Amino acid sequence: MKADYKKINSILTYTSTALKNPKIIKDKDLVVLLTIIQEEAKQNRIFYDYKRKFRPAVTRFTIDNNFEIPDCLVKLLSAVETPKAWSGFS
């Protein structure tokens, strides 16, 4: 999904900050998703989470870390595109 450069630059900033966080690095599933999000942003696209895996990964990370969530993950939650509703049959 194409997006404006301001949003893409913020996604790149948030993902690089998140990938430097030692607590986040321990969560392999979250690291994989953050890397995918970062690669999409490097190609001037916003990651579209059609399988809805990012939000549950952040939730698991938050629960595992005594409900502490880094600011960069909160901001990434709003930047990642997710389906708004079920699309039905095609």
Swiss-Prot record:
Protein name: Sakacin-A immunity factor
Lineage: superkingdom: Bacteria
Gene Ontology process terms (BP): bacteriocin immunity
Job description of the protein: Imparts immunity to sakacin-A to naturally sensitive host strains.
Keyword check for Lyase: no
Name of the gene this protein is made from: saiA
Organism: Latilactobacillus sakei (Lactobacillus sakei)
Keyword Cell membrane included in the entry's annotation: no
Record keywords, A-Z: Bacteriocin immunity, Plasmid
